[in-house]
């Protein structure tokens, strides 16, 4: 059994001494009675987690999942400049005109200035990372030997190792 010390004013100590039981027994019984009544009141939750805050959600209040896919930097500009009609942006997807991603990359990278693929900020030729969002400006591919290779090459011309893109092309 542990020892508990109580501090009380003189009137309370005198009232406890006037009782027939010992001070320790009186204080134990008082503490048990207090904990029993207050613990029972504390066990009842004030609010239930399952209690709805608002009423049942209507169709207009339900969550909506939105997926935005940007396949080129120019698509970012199209989405930004396209006005939304009725809460819905009907931006034309790039690539619908039959142009492949590789052709689009070749046409957009003709000048010294390029555009960040993540945020659309203009990048100069010496930028490795976008100064606006920190996204990688150049997506250069290197072989395990350290030589820079093109992403569409299946083998490294320096060491002859098979590249990751070569493995992907082989399995396709």
Curated annotation (Swiss-Prot):
Region (Disordered): 72-113
Zn finger spans (DZANK-type): 116-160
Main location: cytoplasm
Subcellular location(s) per record: Cytoplasm
Matching InterPro entries: DZR
Entry GO terms, CC: cytoplasm
GO terms for MF: DNA binding; zinc ion binding
UniProt KW keywords: Cell cycle, Cell division, Cytoplasm, DNA-binding, Metal-binding, Transcription, Transcription regulation, Zinc, Zinc-finger
GO process terms (BP): cell division
Job description of the protein: Transcriptional regulator involved in the control of cell division. Is a specific and direct regulator of the cdrS-ftsZ2 operon. Acts by binding to the promoter region upstream of the operon. The CdrSL-FtsZ2 transcriptional network might coordinate cell division timing with cell growth.
Family membership: Belongs to the CdrL family.
Name of the molecule in the record: Transcriptional regulator CdrL
Source organism (scientific name): Halobacterium salinarum (strain ATCC 700922 / JCM 11081 / NRC-1)
Gene: cdrL
